[in-house]
Amino acid sequence: MAAMAVGGAGGSRVSSGRDLNCVPEIADTLGAVAKQGFDFLCMPVFHPRFKREFIQEPAKNRPGPQTRSDLLLSGRDWNTLIVGKLSPWIHPDSKVEKIRRNSEAAMLQELNFGAYLGLPAFLLPLNQEDNTNLARVLTNHIHTGHHSSMFWMRVPLVAPEDLRDDVIANAPTTHTEEYSGEEKTWMWWHNFRTLCDYSKRIAVALEIGADLPSNHVIDRWLGEPIKAAILPTSIFLTNKKGFPVLSKVQQRLIFRLLKLEVQFIITGTNHHSEKEFCSYLQYLEYLSQNRPPPNAYELFAKGYEDYLQSPLQPLMDNLESQTYEVFEKDPIKYSQYQQAIYKCLLDRVPEEEKETNVQVLMVLGAGRGPLVNASLRAAKQAERRIRLYAVEKNPNAVVTLENWQFEEWGSQVTVVSSDMREWVAPEKADIIVSELLGSFADNELSPECLDGAQHFLKDDGVSIPGEYTSFLAPISSSKLYNEVRACREKDRDPEAQFEMPYVVRLHNFHQLSAPKPCFTFSHPNRDPMIDNNRYCTLEFPVEVNTVLHGFAGYFETVLYRDITLSIRPETHSPGMFSWFPIFFPIKQPITVHEGQNICVRFWRCSNSKKVWYEWAVTAPVCSSIHNPTGRSYTIGL
C-alpha cells in the first residue's frame, strides 16, 4: 500500500508517518494516508476513550470485543504500515493505587495486542519525571514472549510547562525537579533507558516544538538512539505562497536528523487549509533534496556508520589484497607523502649536486607499492636521483612488488622480502618512509617497528613520518554502548568486550569535550634507552548533563616539516578516508553533571611479545582499570 514501511528510512527519500488520535475506519484511513504520500500511520490500538476496568466488578467482565478485529487489515499491513499508540488515559505511575493497577493491566493488554498484530513499533509517552513503573511494565513485556516490536518513547525536546507564557512571577511552582527546562526531558529519557538497562528495542521519538533548546542540548540528543522525529503542524510557518515552512534553526535540526536517517511523523490538523495536507510532507522532501551533499569521507564511509571493527594487526597478521586495495584508493594520503618526500629531497640535495648525489630511500612496510610509486613521483618532481629499497614482510604482497619491479620500476628499486626489524641492510638510508600508523597513531606498533629499523638510518637521516600524536575525547553513545555489549563471546569473560578498542565510523554519538593529546612519538628516536611505554592523565570539562560511554581516539602526524595528516575532527585532512576513529569503551556508563570534569588515566604497556593499553576513569567517579595485563586485548609484536 505504501512505498516504504516503518523502519525503512534510507536513500534520498524521506520516510514519514501520519499521527492520528482517532481512526474510525482503519482501511479507508490507511488508504487516504498512503495517497497523501505517507509511509505509515500512527494510531491507537484501542479506542482512546474506551477505559477498560480490570479490577472491579461488574465492569471487569463487560461482554463484547475490547477493540476492532485484526481481520480489517492483512498481516503484512499490520506488520509494516501501523505504529501503535498507548491510550492517553493510561497512567502506570499514578499515585492513586487503583488507577496505577488498572493502568498496568491496560498497558499490558495494549502491548500484548500490538505484539499479536505484529506491529513494527509502538509509541509510548514520556511526559513526566517519574516513569519508573512504566519502565517496569515495558521491561516485563519485552522479556516475555517472542515478539520483536520496537518501542518509541515520545519525548518532547522541551518540557511542555516550560513553554507557558502565563506563569506568574514568583508564583510557587508545583514541581521540585532539580533540572532546568531544556535539561529536564533528557533526564526523563536517560533515567528511563537506564531503568530499562539500555534495551536495544527502546528508542526515542523526539517531539520538536516551536522553540528549540540551546545547541549543546541538541548535540546531546543527537547522540541518542533517535528513530523518529515528531513534527506538530503548529510549528510550521507560512511562506509568501501560503505553503508550510520551518524556521532556519529548525531546518538545521532537520538536516542533522536526516543524517541519522530518522523517520518523520506529522501530527496535528492542517494549519494551512488552502493547501493539501501533503504539503507538509512535500516540504520535508524539499529539505531532504536541498541538504548539503555528503563529502568524500561520508560517501566512502556509507554503510560503516557505528559498525565496530577490530583494529588491524599488520605486524602479527598478513593483510589481504582487498585491505591494501581500500587504503590505496585514498586520494589525499599518498599525495601528502609525495609532497613530504619531494620537500625532503630538495632540502637534502642542493641544485648543484642533483646529478651526483643519489639519496638512499627505504620504504618500510611497502605493501603493494603505493609509497614506492609516491617516492618515484616525488624524485621525478624534485629532479633528484634516488636508490630505493621496498621492504615488506608479507610474502603475498611481495609478489605484487616483484611484478611492479619487473614491469615498471626496474633496477631503481630493490624488493626485500623481510621483517624490517630483522633485515640486514647493505647500506644506510638517507630517508626512511613508512605508513605504519593506526587510528590511535601507535596502535599498529609503528614505534617498535621504526625503532627496530633505525639502525640502518644515517646519523643525519630523516624519517617520514617524523612525529605522531594520539588524541582522546570523551563521548556519549547509546548505540556504541549497545554494539559493544552485543560483542560478548561465549568462552570469554562476560565483560571482555569492554576491555578492547574498536575502529568505528562514529555517527550516532555526542562528543562531550574537545580532544586532548595523549601520547607522542618522534623518529628517529635518539634516546640511549628507548622506552615506548607511556602514562598520561587527561581532564575534560563538561558543559552539559550527560552520560559517558567511552573515549574516541584520533591522531595527527607530521610527515615532514609542514606536511601533515590528521583524523582529529578539528584538523581532519580534507577528503582523507584511510582511517576511522578508534573507540575505547567503559564497562558501566557514568552519569556526568554540568560543570564536572571527566578525568581519564591511560597507559601504554608492553613486554617482549606484545603491547596493550589500559585505561580507567577517575572522575567524576572511579571506574575499574580496564584491560589490566592485557588480559582481554593485546597487539602482537
From Swiss-Prot:
Catalysed reaction equations from the record: L-arginyl-[protein] + 2 S-adenosyl-L-methionine = N(omega),N(omega)'-dimethyl-L-arginyl-[protein] + 2 S-adenosyl-L-homocysteine + 2 H(+)
Principal subcellular localization: cytoplasm
Record region (Beta barrel): 465-637
Control of this protein's activity: Activity is increased by EGF, HGF, FGF1 or FGF2 treatments, and slightly decreased by NGF treatment.
GO biological process: circadian regulation of gene expression; DNA-templated transcription termination; gene expression; Golgi ribbon formation; negative regulation of transcription by RNA polymerase II; peptidyl-arginine methylation; positive regulation of mRNA splicing, via spliceosome; spliceosomal snRNP assembly
InterPro entries reported for this sequence: Arg_MeTrfase, Arg_MeTrfase_PRMT5, PRMT5, PRMT5_C, PRMT5_TIM, SAM-dependent_MTases_sf
Active site residues according to the UniProt entry: 435 (proton donor/acceptor), 444 (proton donor/acceptor)
This protein's UniProt keywords: Acetylation, Biological rhythms, Chromatin regulator, Cytoplasm, Golgi apparatus, Methyltransferase, Nucleus, Repressor, S-adenosyl-L-methionine, Transcription, Transcription regulation, Transferase
Subcellular location: Cytoplasm; Nucleus; Golgi apparatus
Record note on quaternary structure: Forms, at least, homodimers and homotetramers. Component of the methylosome complex, composed of PRMT5, WDR77 and CLNS1A. Found in a complex composed of PRMT5, WDR77 and RIOK1. RIOK1 and CLNS1A associate with PRMT5 in a mutually exclusive fashion, which allows the recruitment of distinct methylation substrates, such as nucleolin/NCL and Sm proteins, respectively. Interacts with PRDM1. Identified in a complex composed of methylosome and PRMT1 and ERH. Interacts with EGFR; methylates EGFR and stimulates EGFR-mediated ERK activation. Interacts with HOXA9. Interacts with SRGAP2.
UniProt-recorded name of the protein: Protein arginine N-methyltransferase 5
Source organism of this protein record: Mus musculus (Mouse)
